[in-house]
Amino acid sequence: MDCVENARLQSKVLIESLPYLRQFHGETVVIKYGGHAMKDEALKKAFALNVALLKLVGINPVIVHGGGPQIGKMLEQLNIQSHFREGLRVTDDATMDVVEMVLVGKVNKEIVNQMNLAGAKAVGLSGKDGMLIRARKMEMVISKEAQAPEIIDLGKVGEVMGVNTTLLRSLERDGFVPVIAPVGVDDNGETYNINADAVAGAVAAALKAKRLLLLTDVAGILDHDKKLIRSVNMREAVNLFSDGTLTGGMIPKVKCCLEALEEGVEKAMIIDGRTENCILLELLTDKGVGTEIVSDRAAQAACNCVLR
């Protein structure tokens, strides 16, 4: 491709993005950052540049990040045993100390540094800062057919009870990009490890964000033939639970999306974080790079049976 043809292609891409830039100008977009996109150096740099560009054109990104592999690596180095129940890390006091150290002290600051180098004014936060994420201990009960319900003690695993939107709005107005580590605190000062998808969904709901984006290590929601499902409404998404389409880690991600939509978020996207510039491709182009779940008020009642 010669220089002129390349310039024409670039101009076409810019024109295609114009209606989306208008649509999202001044709006909040919450992005859950995790998976391979946090490990590959090229993807890390692209992510930071994507976020910086969004802020530059008047869109307000709020980032919530994970860090499971980094936590696991540090626990192994410290010879602290760790195990999972129902996909959640059982978190005793020693594990909680490591979780907070890794997420807040290391991973969060690395992301903030990368974004600042890209030109964004990023500010690192945990749920403790300004009581940003109020939490409580998660209660988990597993019911199996013909068996008594099993109560699982996950230790210091929490669930979100409230979000300090005043703090986040203040940072947005002053031109900052909040970068949130998924550590919460209760009214007694107890610290909790919270699933990053759940925090992202709760933040999006509290801010009434225009979009919620969850970066994953798959193309999006796949059907039984392993083909990408590009768009579903809430009712269709609920049906994916009952027909067996959703399995493993995709189940809590879709639940998180539905909860956010139920609280007023317009669309939630599960996108392929392995694709360079996936955020810009999803938000500012016609096709996108994942699965969108669209708010459907008529379907909200059907969601209650899945979410509660």
Swiss-Prot record:
- Under Enzyme Commission nomenclature, its number is 2.7.2.8
Q: What is this protein called?
A: Acetylglutamate kinase
**Record has Nucleotide-binding as a keyword:** yes
Reaction(s) this enzyme catalyzes, per UniProt: N-acetyl-L-glutamate + ATP = N-acetyl-L-glutamyl 5-phosphate + ADP
Describe the family membership recorded for this protein in Swiss-Prot or TrEMBL. Belongs to the acetylglutamate kinase family. ArgB subfamily.
- Origin species, per record, is Nitratidesulfovibrio vulgaris (strain ATCC 29579 / DSM 644 / CCUG 34227 / NCIMB 8303 / VKM B-1760 / Hildenborough)
NCBIfam families xref list: argB
The residues the record assigns to binding substrate are G67, G68, R89, N193
Cite the position(s) of the site with description Transition state stabilizer.
Answer: K32, K253
Role description? Catalyzes the ATP-dependent phosphorylation of N-acetyl-L-glutamate.
Entry keyword set? Amino-acid biosynthesis, Arginine biosynthesis, ATP-binding, Cytoplasm, Kinase, Nucleotide-binding, Transferase
Q: In which pathway does it act?
A: Amino-acid biosynthesis; L-arginine biosynthesis; N(2)-acetyl-L-ornithine from L-glutamate: step 2/4
* Superkingdom in the source lineage: Bacteria
